[in-house]
């Protein structure tokens, strides 16, 4: 019934829960997501709540009583961490410089054109290895990568540019959507309809038909046909390939994608707390058994339920 994929919410016990969009970054005026939402005509209609400036994320470890704050704004980010790691000032400074530098190579991310010559070597920099090259301090390594669940951080696979693009937005500014992430989807649907567009729900696309080396139309399970010039699929690439009867892609590319290993999902518990039992904090908490924050995805069925 709902639209929006991970923007969807659900209600239990009279309380609304987000499924995917719990908080978002880059919403201060002039920042990337603000620019996109403003262009789409929904920014002024979104109700947003800015998170804790001095620690919108708190990284926590077993047997360590300290909470490690991820501060908002790069100066504040450095201030919060150098107060805990005074001997690591240079590493923290370099981390911030390198994150911002990598983000400059992605014009769509920055909503601008640039003259940077893209270096493909950037795509091969490993997040874990790069953070380890910045500092030998185990705690600081764990803190800098402590919210890697945001991009399903994987020891030998997660590239640093992905880490940079995501963390940069949150460090710039972090917000919660008042009323739930589905508000974004509802506002977009309203805007599309205002501009004369149509939004269809519960339409199961079973085939993408081609003509002249382009996708020409989509066919749904109830035999409706939708013609168009551009088709965007946000389902799993493997499933998208199955919909294209006459493949427009090289077999070698399809085989490579089909042979890629899927990442591990997460087990999520949503809880309604008893009123007036736990004080509200305008922060997120990431908890780990050790300073090794990369072991989560390395999981075997035999380990359940640890």
Regions found by a protein language model. Give the residues of each.
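Helical element adjacent to the flavin cofactor pocket in flavoenzyme catalytic cores
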Residues: 164-221, 229
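Glycine-rich phosphate/pyrophosphate-binding beta-alpha loops
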Residues: 21-26, 148-153, 266-268
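Mid-domain catalytic core of redox enzymes
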Residues: 176, 206-306
């Amino acid at each position: 019934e709902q639209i929006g994929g991970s923007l969807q919410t659900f209600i239990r016990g009279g309380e609304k829960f987000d499924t995917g969009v719990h908080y978002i970054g880059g919403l201060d005026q002039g920042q990337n997501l603000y620019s996109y939402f403003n262009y789409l005509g929904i920014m002024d209609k979104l109700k947003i709540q800015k998170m804790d400036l001095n620690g919108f994320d708190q990284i926590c470890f077993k047997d360590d009583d300290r909470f490690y704050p991820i501060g908002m704004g790069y100066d504040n980010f450095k201030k919060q961490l150098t107060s805990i790691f005074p001997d690591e000032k240079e590493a923290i400074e370099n981390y911030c410089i390198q994150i911002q530098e990598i983000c400059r190579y992605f014009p769509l991310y920055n909503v601008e054109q640039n003259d940077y010559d893209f270096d493909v070597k950037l795509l091969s920099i490993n997040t874990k290895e790069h953070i380890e090259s910045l500092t030998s301090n185990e705690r600081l390594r764990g803190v800098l990568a402590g919210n890697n669940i945001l991009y399903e951080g994987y020891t030998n696979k997660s590239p640093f540019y992905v880490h940079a693009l995501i963390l940069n937005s949150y460090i710039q500014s972090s917000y919660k959507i008042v009323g739930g992430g589905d508000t974004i989807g509802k506002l977009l649907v309203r805007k599309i309809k205002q501009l004369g567009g149509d939004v269809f729900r519960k339409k199961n696309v079973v085939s993408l038909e081609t003509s002249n080396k382009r996708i020409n139309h989509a066919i749904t399970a109830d035999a409706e046909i939708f013609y168009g010039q551009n088709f965007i699929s946000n389902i799993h690439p493997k499933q998208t390939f199955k919909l294209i009867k006459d493949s427009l892609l090289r077999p070698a590319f399809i085989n490579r994608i089909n042979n890629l290993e899927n990442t591990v999902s997460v087990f999520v518990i949503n809880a309604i707390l008893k009123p007036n039992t736990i004080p509200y904090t305008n922060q997120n908490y990431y908890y780990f058994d050790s300073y090794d924050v990369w072991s989560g995805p390395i999981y075997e069925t035999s380990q359940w339920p640890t």
